[in-house]
Each structure stands twice: as structure tokens, then as C-alpha cells.
Amino acid sequence: MGFFLFSPTRYLDGISGFFQWAFLLSLFLVLFKAVQFYLRRQWLLKTLQHFPCMPSHWLWGHHLKDKELQQILIWVEKFPSACLQCLSGSNIRVLLYDPDYVKVVLGRSDPKASGIYQFFAPWIGYGLLLLNGKKWFQHRRMLTPAFHYDILKPYVKIMADSVNIMLDKWEKLDGQDHPLEIFHCVSLMTLDTVMKCAFSYQGSVQLDENSKLYTKAVEDLNNLTFFRLRNAFYKYNIIYNMSSDGRLSHHACQIAHEHTDGVIKMRKSQLQNEEELQKARKKRHLDFLDILLFARMEDRNSLSDEDLRAEVDTFMFEGHDTTASGISWIFYALATHPEHQQRCREEVQSILGDGTSVTWDHLGQMPYTTMCIKEALRLYPPVISVSRELSSPVTFPDGRSIPKGITATISIYGLHHNPRFWPNPKVFDPSRFAPDSSHHSHAYLPFSGGSRNCIGKQFAMNELKVAVALTLLRFELLPDPTRIPVPIARLVLKSKNGIHLCLKKLR
């Protein structure tokens, strides 16, 4: 009869040996990645040596915290046309801010830069913003009718109703003596507008406290996704998911998805009513969500549930957050330039009177107000950059070239502040957009350009005009001298300390 003798010493030796091997393996992997990172970085710097690059940290790159926009302006003045921007790790991209360079890139069909946009996917999925190739073309063609002018015309009244709800709330505040942080109010208003116009929502999210959960989730995801792009270690899902930022991002995504799922479910329920279904079918042009739902009904293979939600998540974000940024910065620009604000107000009063009725035709009769809106979007573009991953080499007019596989980033912020094309670029000067003025076709791109320009740009411009016109009829906008906004780079242009304005009632 044999006996098995348990030996604690042998057991501990075994455990010790396992950890030794695990440590050696981990050390090898770390060294391997370090060598790989070093070689990749050196190759990129050599390959792109014709483009200037400011000194940067070997790991964190141009780690500028909230000073990235100020640094871009320095690069624009120091380096003609383009330069290198080192992000974290071996992530180096070519930053373009010359219209001739930008025109070349936007005239091609390169895909979105996967190394950047992949981090948007857990939030907004693969909708128009992230899709490439044939599927992007199919979705773009399917959704374009949602922005036909026959669809956009009746939206003007809906936009006006949403703006007036916001202004009614402002009327009840003592905004003259107590400055108001306007971005959150404007964000709820633009969400209200997109919900009613694109998603057939009944009611007002501005009067629903639960809607603030969604706008807060979008704000968090805006920051968290941007920070992830700037952290070399966060590109690995396993590390990011275990981090505090990763957990916060997961929670915010859940809130955002619950909101969009609720919107889809509500509209599906409405269309189960035969009367509502026939009413929708008789429309000459369907709205955004109905296009998706009818496409899903007619051919379940053409559009999956994941595709549908991705498009809803994408437009829900782009249709309210970018517009909220634009409106907030326009208000600030007008507040700090009272002479232009008053001229806009007089123009609006001559067209709208007391503002009880705003129509599509009215929006085309505001030339000076439109000039001011465009100039504010030049100074404060809601989307500060777009990136492409080159599918083939590209050569620019001056002979410099970028090889295949490199990320080319169009700095819209840098482009709009390029002194070679915009003299005194920091000065608010609406005359730049006077009818008799001209500028390079690719020097002004608040809605990007080329085949992948913003599908909802006319929708957005209409909303900007309605918001500015109705606000100027009811309030004089004054800056808060104690809290001057500091623009910072995020997925959408934000202010580090909010946008605070004093509101003086006019009636």
C-alpha cells in the first residue's frame, strides 16, 4: 500500500517557479513592446523627416493637457502648411492646416483613421461617422433624403419652439446679476430639437429631468474618449476596461444606449398603430429614424439592429453636441462684440418683428447675422479636426509626400486660424464673409468637406440661425469679465471653465 506525502516545501517551490517564469515572460513582453515601439517611432520620424516636429517626450509625445489649441496656433505660425504631432507611444500623425494640402486629402477616398475612431465605437457604433467603403456609401445614400429641403422646412418651427422653451426658462432667472453657464442649457435645447425633428419625439426633453442623465453621459464620453486617445496604455482594451476611466466610460455608454434604445422602441411602438403607420407611409420624405425603421421592415438583411442603433447613436450625438458647442460659442462671440450683436438684432427685428413666427424663408433674409455666425464658427469650430488613414501615398503641391498607412489629420482649428489665409485670425471680423468677399475653397470647413462632409450641415445652420435670432430678440448678451472661457480640445470644442454670460432682458 502506497502513501502520497504532501510536501509544503515542494508545493511552495512549484508556486515560486511559476511566478519566476511568469515574471520572465512578462519582462520579455515588455522589452519586446518597448523595442517595437522604439523602432516604429524611429521609422515614422525618418519617413516623415520632411515635416518639422517640435521636441516631444519619448513616451507621452506632445502632452499638452489643455493647451493643445494654443500649441497648434504656434505651430501654424512657425511651420508652413503642416507639421508632425506626436501623441502617446508611437502614435505620430501629420497635422495639416494649409487649404491646398487639405484639398488634396479631402479629394481622395481614404478611410477614417482606425487608430483614432475605433475608440468611438463602444459608444456610437459603426454608423456614418465610423463606416468606410461600400457600407458607408449605402448608408449615406439611404439617409441623405432625411435632409432634403422639403423635410427641413417644417423643422424651422420645431426649432423655434425648442429655443423658446429655453428662453422662457432664462426669463425666470436673474441672469443679469448672476451669470449663467449656458452650455448645459443649450445642450438640452439642441437635444430637444433633434429628438423632435429626427426621431418623431412628442413632448420636450428640456422639461424632463431624466434627459440630463443623457447629456451628462455625452459630456463624460466626450472627455473620456478624448483622454483615451492621448494615453498610450489605454489603447489596449484589457488595460482600459480595468481602469477607472474605462469603468466610467462603460457606465456612460450604458446610459447613452438606454436613451437611444428608448427612442427606437417608442417609435416602433407608434408605428404598430395602423393609422400612424399609414400617415408615415404617405409622407413624401421620411424623417431620419423612420427611414431606418422602414428600411429594416422592408429588408431585414440590409440593415441590422446594430446598424440601426449605431446610426441613431451617431446622429443623436452629432446632432446635438456639436450644435450646442456652435451656438454657445456664437453667443459668446456676440456678447464680446456688442456692436455686431446690436446690428444682428436690428436685422432680425426688421424681419421677424416680435419673433412670434419664424419660417424657412426668413432664414435666408439675415445676411449680416449669417456673416456673424460664420465668423464665430471660424474662430470656434465645433469639430476641431478630422483624420484619414492614407490608403495610398499622397504628394502635395510643394513636393512633400506622405506614405501609405500614415494618419493625416486636418486641423480645422489650425486651418481657421492660419494667418496666411485669414489676416489677424484672432480678430472677430464678420466682413470676411460678406457677399463680395472671397477665400480659398478649403480655408473654411466648419462642417468638414469632400464626400464625407457633415450630412446635417443645413439642418445645423438652420438651427444656429433660429437660436441666434430668437435669443437676440429677447436678451442682450453680456460677457462675464470674471470668467473668460478657455477653449480646449475635446471631441467637440469645449471651454475649460464653461461659457458664462449675463442675460439682460429686453422685454
Curated annotation (Swiss-Prot):
Q: Which pathway is this protein engaged in? A: Lipid metabolism; fatty acid metabolism
Write down what this protein is called: Cytochrome P450 4A14
Modified residues annotated as Phosphoserine in this record: 437
**Which ranges of the sequence are coiled-coil?**
none
Q: Which reactions fall under this protein's catalytic activity?
A: dodecanoate + reduced [NADPH--hemoprotein reductase] + O2 = 12-hydroxydodecanoate + oxidized [NADPH--hemoprotein reductase] + H2O + H(+); dodecanoate + reduced [NADPH--hemoprotein reductase] + O2 = 11-hydroxydodecanoate + oxidized [NADPH--hemoprotein reductase] + H2O + H(+); (5Z,8Z,11Z,14Z)-eicosatetraenoate + reduced [NADPH--hemoprotein reductase] + O2 = 11,12-epoxy-(5Z,8Z,14Z)-eicosatrienoate + oxidized [NADPH--hemoprotein reductase] + H2O + H(+)
Q: Give the source species.
A: Mus musculus (Mouse)
List the GO cellular component terms: endoplasmic reticulum membrane
Its job: A cytochrome P450 monooxygenase involved in the metabolism of fatty acids. Mechanistically, uses molecular oxygen inserting one oxygen atom into a substrate, and reducing the second into a water molecule, with two electrons provided by NADPH via cytochrome P450 reductase (CPR; NADPH-ferrihemoprotein reductase). Catalyzes the hydroxylation of saturated carbon hydrogen bonds of fatty acids. May act as a major omega- and ommega-1 hydroxylase for dodecanoic (lauric) acid in kidney. Catalyzes with low efficiency the epoxidation of 11,12-double bond of arachidonic acid.
Q: What cofactor does this one take?
A: heme
* Distribution of this protein across tissues and organs: Gender- and strain-specific expression in kidney (at protein level). Predominantly expressed in females, the expression among strains decreasing in the following order: FVB/N > NMRI > Balb/c > 129 Sv/J > C57BL/6. Expressed at very low level in liver, kidney and spleen of both male and female C57BL/6 X CBA hybrid mice.
Provide the membrane topology annotation: Peripheral membrane protein
Per the UniProt record, one Pfam family is: p450
Residue ranges the record assigns to the propeptide: 1-4
Q: What does the record give under GO molecular function?
A: heme binding; iron ion binding; monooxygenase activity; oxidoreductase activity, acting on paired donors, with incorporation or reduction of molecular oxygen
Q: Where does heme bind?
A: 318, 454
